[in-house]
Structure formats: C-alpha cells, structure tokens
C-alpha cells in the first residue's frame, strides 16, 4: 500500500488545510467549500476513511494450495531419518496426526477456493398462507412490556392473516429486532389473533409482563433508507386526524419543527422523529397532505336562486388566472406548503440579511443601526430612481439616477428585485447592487417587501430572513409617543395607522411565515437590536439548517 495513504487522518487534515486556496485555484463557490468542510469534518466520514484504509491494506495470499501433497513428500523423506533420530520421529508423528491433517486440508480448500456458499433461504409464497404451517417454520418471540406501553408496530390484513405493516423507528420492536415487516402473527400468549388489526393492537397494548408471540417469519431483507430531513410548514395533531391508521403511533409537530424521515415505504404515511431526539411516529406523507389540503368543493353548488324553478342549480365557475409576476401575491395565498427538505450545514456567514415586516414597524431603523455598528461587516444597496437629482444630491449618495426609459427596460428584463412608482417617478432595487455588496465581502442588509424573499431565497444569496413583528396596539402607540418626545421621529401615527400596522404584520406572518428564519417582536428597539446581533453571531458558531437546494 502506498505510504501516502497509510494515514487517513493526516491525509484528510491536509485537504482541510488547503481548502482556503481552492477558490482561487478552481473557482469553487464559497457555499460548496463550506459544505465540503462539513463533510470532511464529519465523524462518519472519518470512520469511513479508516474503514477504507483497512480494506485497502495488502491482502494475504496463500503461498500454495497443495500442502497435503507436500506433507506426504516430507513424510517419505523422514521415513529413513525417523529410525535414527527421535526428533525426526516426533515430527513425522505430528504431521500424521488427524487434527493437523484436517487443518491442512481446510487451508488448501480455502486457498484454492473450492468451497461453496449455501443457497439463500427462499421467501414464502403468500398463496400458501392458509395452508398448514410446518412446525420448523414457526418462531416464538418473547417481549416484556408494561400495560399501556405501545410496541411501535402496526398491522394489516393480508390473505386473511394479520401481517406486520410497519415497524416504527426507535420503538420497542425496532430496538429488539425480533420482528420484521411482513411477519404473520398467529397467536398471542397461546390465543389465536383472528383478523382484526384494531383488536390485536388493543390486546397488545393492555398486555403486561411477558408477551409470547407465535409468528410466521417473512424472510424479507430490510433496506437502509437514505437520510431525509424536512422543515414542517403546518401543525399536525394525530389525535385529531380521522385518517390516521393508528393515532397512538402518530407524531405531533408544529410549523417550523425539523423532522428526520426514517421510512417512506408507505405512500400515505411516513415514519419520522424530531431531530432533537425521541421515538419515531407516523406523519402524513407529502402526497396525502397535498390531497387533503387541495380538496375543493364541486363546481356546482345546490343553492336555490330566486325567481327560478324548484330544483334548478346555481353554477359557480372556477376562476382561471394566467400567472403574472406582478400578481404573485395572489398565487402565494394558494401555495400548498407541506414539507421542505433541508440539510444541516456547519457554521457559515450568510450573504444577505433580509428584514421583513409591516410599514412603520422599525425595519429601516434596525438596518441603519446594524450598518453603523459594524460598517466593515454590513452594507446595503443604493436604490435607483428615474427622477432628476436635486442640486444637493450626488450620484450614488442616497440614490443612483437613471432615465425612465432605461429603468423601464431593466424592469422588463427582470434586473430589479422590487420597484414602485411615487409621484410619477420610478424607484427600485437592482439585483446587481446586491451582488456588488456581497462581492465586497459584506453581508447585504435589505428591508424589502415579503414577495421579494422568493427571488432572494437561492444558493446565490443564501439569505437569513428575519421577521420584525409588530407588538400589540397599545405597545405600538406608546413607542410612537416615546419616539416623538425624544425627537427620534417627527411623524405622529394616527389610530388608523397603528391598527393598520398591527393588521398588516399579522397578514405577513400568515402568508410568508414559512420563509422566516427568526421572528422578533419589536416592542423595544434597543432590545430587538441586541437580539438581532446575537442571532447573527450564532450563525458563525452554530450549525444551520438550510434548504437542500442550496447544497445539492
């Protein structure tokens, strides 16, 4: 084996030490290098490298595979010497011993590879499930449990028999490894089980102490699933789900929770567990939940119309719309949000910080405070406008000035993240401006409309999205009064303005909450700013969960 490969630890460390020079040499993206470092530093990968090193070691080969013939030649040569030397006689006696002869015979068989592997056990034909079972095919499995304890297994009826449908990851049965999917349950504590899955579940749940199961093994080979992690975008309570095959085996979760999917064999029900730990449970699959949420009423509703004959129908046609980016908020309201596949990344700095919130909630104040606090680390874009510059204004200081025709052409070409018109003039944020701030090595801080997050949420911008939530009405009014008294603000908000801010904040949270990485209630600007600082520092020291599309 080559010397350079004898020490996998030093070889991997050498790769890690040289990752910093890869961007210049290969043009690799920063996010790809972060992902590569996370893989290289993973204990699993290091263990695999050690295993590979062991497997690649020089294999021992037999010198010869006819040692029995060689021993016979030696014995013939020793025949004459044995009469003259006691040592030769002892050697001849050892070489002729049955145990030594068997050892040499076994060695020669292995060296010449003349051995045969026995054929695998054939699977059982389900068509014979109702025929008498040979006594040697039945197994007895013993389980100790307490009353009310769930075994972590569900059943189905197949050919009149109760068959194990699924084994929940992390449950009692999965940990013991004595039962497998497809096993047929014949008896429980000597009593036939019948053909009712719910009755069997209740019998097993109420049993305590030693439970003896008579089973007919399935001989199915289990397969190892790939690791899948998802972020949930809805709340789920199995106790309230009428479709659940086993409410006790369900897993409860809330929107924003991170789950590991451990089994997806069933098209409608997956097995999952919380990434923080705990036993696995059943959750509705992506397909099942999409069907449930997409269920709509029939086109014709049986509602009587005045002035018509009895029994006539009032028809309601479905509204058809062509997708327009200018009206994407309408489509966002009808987007089905179930699960989002995510991946765990080592600590890294996000390229953009996106502040989302209602108008007047304090986004711009937080952005300005963050840039003033660390201008070498944070920056922002200069907005573009089609209005003419004032005498005191300079290009790039406050605004970048372009003609209306040029700006309209760039808007049609999709070069603006967002844009609007005020008093006959266009204003907007160019996407290239964001790229420029990121290229300078700074985090680009943006306070944009919620619709813009869909454009930014890519591997190019890897945004950290923070929702600045409005406090309750009374707190918001007190904050505005304090800002007026301290001279921080000169605009007094009316009662309608305050209520509008609170209502808009709630609408944004309902419609775009699945995009938020963090939510901060801005009831005190200084406290909210400190919480934002802390969150940004954690990104540099703690692992992060990001959409899997950013990684692969």
Swiss-Prot record:
SMART domains, A to Z: GuKc, L27, PDZ, SH3
In-chain residues carrying the UniProt-annotated modification Phosphothreonine: 117
L27 domain residues: 8-59, 60-118
Keyword set, alphabetical order: Cell projection, Cytoplasm, Cytoskeleton, Membrane, Phosphoprotein, Repeat, SH3 domain, Synapse
List of residues that carry Phosphoserine: 42, 121
Span of domain SH3: 225-293
Listed GO CC annotations: cytoplasm; cytoskeleton; dendrite membrane; dendritic shaft; dendritic spine; glutamatergic synapse; postsynaptic density; postsynaptic density membrane
Annotated PDZ domain residues: 140-219
Post-translational modification: Phosphorylated by SRC.
Record InterPro entries: GK/Ca_channel_bsu (IPR008145), Guanylate_kin-like_dom (IPR008144), Guanylate_kinase_CS (IPR020590), L27_C (IPR014775), L27_dom (IPR004172), L27_dom_sf (IPR036892), MAGUK (IPR050716), MPP2_SH3 (IPR035602)
A GO biological process held by the record: protein homooligomerization
SUPFAM superfamilies, sorted: L27 domain, P-loop containing nucleoside triphosphate hydrolases, PDZ domain-like, SH3-domain
Top-level taxonomic group: Eukaryota
Major localisation: other
Domain Guanylate kinase-like as annotated: residue spans: 350-537
Subcellular location as annotated: Cell projection, Dendrite; Postsynaptic density; Cytoplasm, Cytoskeleton; Membrane
Gene3D superfamilies: 2.30.42.10, L27 domain, P-loop containing nucleotide triphosphate hydrolases, SH3 Domains
CDD domains referenced in this protein's UniProt entry, alphabetically: GMPK, PDZ_MPP6-MPP2-like, SH3_MPP2
Gene Ontology terms, MF aspect: structural constituent of postsynaptic density; transmembrane transporter binding
Pfam families: Guanylate_kin, L27, PDZ, SH3_2
Annotated tissue distribution: Expressed in pyramidal neurons of CA1 region of the hippocampus.
Job description of the protein: Postsynaptic MAGUK scaffold protein that links CADM1 cell adhesion molecules to core components of the postsynaptic density. In CA1 pyramidal neurons, required for synaptic KCNN2-containing channel function and long-term potentiation expression. Seems to negatively regulate SRC function in epithelial cells.
Family the UniProt entry places it in: Belongs to the MAGUK family.
Protein's name in the database: MAGUK p55 subfamily member 2
Gene name linked to the record: Mpp2
